[in-house]
């Protein structure tokens, strides 16, 4: 799985867990709708650490905790 796909799946997982909408996450994180849309629909080749940090803040968590998921385990990712 590509890193960008894993990030999108992690976002979906956390949105569901927290009963949060994507719109609310955009508002809380400051990530622009276009950027978030590109991540969620696989139109990005990659996701920068700065965007991951913003998204994490939108969830009210540290980016280390966002990345601490089996979805983002390096053994499951296609690193290009």
Language-model segments: what does each one mean?
Residues 43-54:
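Short, basic-rich loop-to-helix N-cap that marks the start of a DNA-contacting helix
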Residues 19-38:
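Short alpha-helical DNA-recognition segment
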């Amino acid at each position: 799985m590509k890193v960008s796909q894993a990030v999108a799946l992690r976002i979906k997982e956390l949105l569901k867990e927290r009963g949060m909408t994507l719109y609310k996450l955009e508002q809380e994180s400051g990530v622009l709708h276009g950027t978030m849309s590109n991540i969620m629909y696989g139109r990005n080749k990659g996701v920068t650490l700065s965007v991951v940090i913003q998204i994490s803040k939108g969830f009210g968590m540290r980016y280390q905790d966002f990345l601490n998921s089996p979805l983002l385990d390096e053994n499951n990712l296609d690193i290009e």
